[in-house]
Amino acid sequence: MVTIALGSKNPVKINATKEALDVLKLNWDLIGIEVDSGVDKQPFCDQTYVGARNRALNVIRVTNADIGLGIEGGVCNVYGKFIANAVVYVITKEGLENFAISSSFTLPSSMVSLILQGKELGEASDIIFKTNNSKTKEGAIGLLTNNVINRKMLYVQPIVLALYPIYNTMINNTPF
């Protein structure tokens, strides 16, 4: 049995990983362990990649799982607009590494202002929408889209994409 360890105990990230494994019809054991990302609570741009990779590395070291999975949300200034997205990073115990990125979405100036004052995206969302702990529920994307797209949905596709070299090799016996 393959064991995949997620570097988070956030229920949205755990449920997104479960859904991705279900979509792929992979009967893998999933464990969620909180590990350090090594980046600020609100990563910007390249730090999002660093945080996701660090989570994958740290969780595989702590658990000795077959696969380490790190998910890190971040924001970045692109052409004068602040966007939010997530990076999903996978590392196998054999050293194979791959990553994928979620869809990106622009943030309203009210959120950007709070983020630039030192708030995390989730905190900024909670302040603006008068919610509590939205990062463990629908997330900023859910609040902004009236839950047409929520945080879990945003994560499922990049999890599938980050894992493809692993499950495709296992199913089809093809090299990466």
Curated annotation (Swiss-Prot):
Recorded catalytic activity of this chain's protein: XTP + H2O = XDP + phosphate + H(+); ITP + H2O = IDP + phosphate + H(+)
Binding sites annotated in the UniProt record for Mg(2+): 36
A single BP term in Gene Ontology: nucleotide metabolic process
Pfam families: NTPase_I-T (PF01931)
Family matches, as Gene3D superfamilies: 3.90.950.10
Note describing how the cofactor binds: Binds 1 divalent metal cation per subunit; can use either Mg(2+) or Mn(2+).
Cofactors (names): Mg(2+); Mn(2+)
GO terms assigned for molecular function: ITPase activity; metal ion binding; nucleotide binding; ribonucleoside triphosphate phosphatase activity
EC number: 3.6.1.73
Keyword Membrane: no
Keyword Metal-binding: yes
Keywords: Hydrolase, Magnesium, Manganese, Metal-binding, Nucleotide metabolism, Nucleotide-binding
Family: Belongs to the YjjX NTPase family.
Function: Phosphatase that hydrolyzes non-canonical purine nucleotides such as XTP and ITP to their respective diphosphate derivatives. Probably excludes non-canonical purines from DNA/RNA precursor pool, thus preventing their incorporation into DNA/RNA and avoiding chromosomal lesions.
HAMAP family: Non_canon_purine_NTPase_YjjX (MF_00648)
Quaternary structure annotation from Swiss-Prot or TrEMBL: Homodimer.
Listed name of the protein: Probable inosine/xanthosine triphosphatase
Organism, scientific name: Saccharolobus islandicus (strain L.S.2.15 / Lassen #1) (Sulfolobus islandicus)
